[in-house]
Curated annotation (Swiss-Prot):
This is NADH-quinone oxidoreductase subunit B. It is a peripheral membrane protein. It is found in: Cell inner membrane. The gene is nuoB. Gene3D superfamilies: 3.40.50.12280. It comes from the Bacteria. The lineage of its organism: Bacteria, Pseudomonadati, Pseudomonadota, Betaproteobacteria, Burkholderiales. One of its GO terms (cellular component) is respiratory chain complex I. PROSITE patterns: COMPLEX1_20K. Its cofactor is [4Fe-4S] cluster.
Length: 159
C-alpha cells in the first residue's frame, strides 16, 4: 500500500483507492476451471509446497463465492457457453487468468475443428500465463502480476 504522507506519530494518510485495492489483492478467491493437464499444475500450486494461502487465496467451488477464474486447459466449442455462463455468475469485480498455451490460443490443438482458439474469445482475460503446462511458479507469478494490476486500478470514478 502506498502511503502519501506520514504526519506526527502514528498518523498516516492514504487514498481510498489504495486501501480498497490493497484489500482486494489480499483476498483473491479463485475458482478452478480445470479442463486438461494444466489443472494438475494449478492443484500443485495450491498444495503445501507453494501454498497460495499466504497470498490470501482460498479456492472456492462456486462462482458466486469467487472473484478470480483460472482457466486451465483446452477449451472446446461445447464448453465455451458453460465458461461464459460461469463467468456471468461471478460477482463484480471479477478477473480471469488464462493458464497454459491451450487456454491462451488453442495450443497443440489450434487447428482442430472443436477447439476455441483462446478463451479470450469467450470471456475477457486479464493475465495470460504461458507454457505447456506452465509450472506452479509461473502460475504464482501470473497471480502476482494480477495483484499488481488490481493495485493500479481506480476504485472511484473521477469526473
Amino acid at each position: 500500500m502506498s502511503l502519501e504522507g506520514v504526519f506526527n506519530e502514528g498518523f498516516m494518510t492514504t487514498s481510498y483507492d489504495s486501501v480498497v485495492n490493497w484489500a482486494k489483492t489480499g483476498s483473491l478467491w479463485p475458482m478452478t476451471f480445470g479442463l486438461a493437464c494444466c489443472a494438475v499444475e494449478m492443484m500443485h500450486a495450491g498444495a503445501a509446497r507453494y501454498d497460495m494461502d499466504r497470498f490470501g487465496m482460498l479456492f472456492r467451488p462456486s462462482p458466486r463465492q469467487s472473484d478470480l477464474m483460472i482457466v486451465a486447459g483446452t477449451l472446446c466449442n461445447k464448453m465455451g457457453p458453460a465458461l461464459r455462463k460461469v463467468y456471468d455468475q461471478m460477482s463484480e469485480p471479477r478477473w480471469v487468468l488464462s493458464m497454459g498455451s491451450c487456454a491462451n490460443g488453442g495450443g497443440y490443438y489450434h487447428y482442430s475443428y472443436s477447439v476455441v482458439r483462446g478463451c479470450d474469445r469467450i470471456v475477457p482475460v486479464d493475465v495470460y500465463v504461458p507454457g505447456c503446462p506452465p509450472t506452479a511458479e509461473a502460475l504464482l507469478y501470473g497471480i502476482i502480476q494480477l495483484q499488481q494490476k488490481i493495485r493500479r486500478t481506480n476504485t472511484i470514478a473521477r469526473a
